[in-house]
Amino acid sequence: MPDRLTPEQRHRCMKSIRSRNTKPEMMVRCYLFSRGFRYRVNVKRLPGTPDIVLRKYRTVIFINGCFWHGHEDCPYFVLPKTNTPFWKAKIERNRERDMQKRIQLRLLGWHTIILWECQLKPKQREMTLKGLERALNQIYLENYSLHKARPYPIIEEETGTMIAADGGEVTTT
């Protein structure tokens, strides 16, 4: 099936597609900020240049478009009828690259969360954002529960009296 647009029109259409500060990304950023999460945006030093980086949580968030990243079983992912072999190969390369970047981030000790464009549509938005908040809180608790507090030592004296850590005496029999 031939393309209905001229090459100049197609170029203009493709050029207008943004990769940063997209509407789904801005929704997530606004929600996180309103809930007290502080983050960095598009950190180039990390593999894949994540959309949102929460350093305190060692977590990165990618907000993927269903078409560009090939979201399987999604109504928003439909291969174009024109130039299908090109698009199929491109989407497959994007998926492979995404997988490699997630592996690299995992090896560096980062948690990765992926949100899909379809999860941020009005019907699922609230549930998705609350799930994201819950996941971040869970990651925070897991990271900080690794450092278990040691109990205070109880010092025993030879007379059978123990001195508690707060200075109070306890007599034992």
Predicted regions, residues:
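Nucleic-acid endo/exonuclease domains
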Residues: 1-114, 118-173
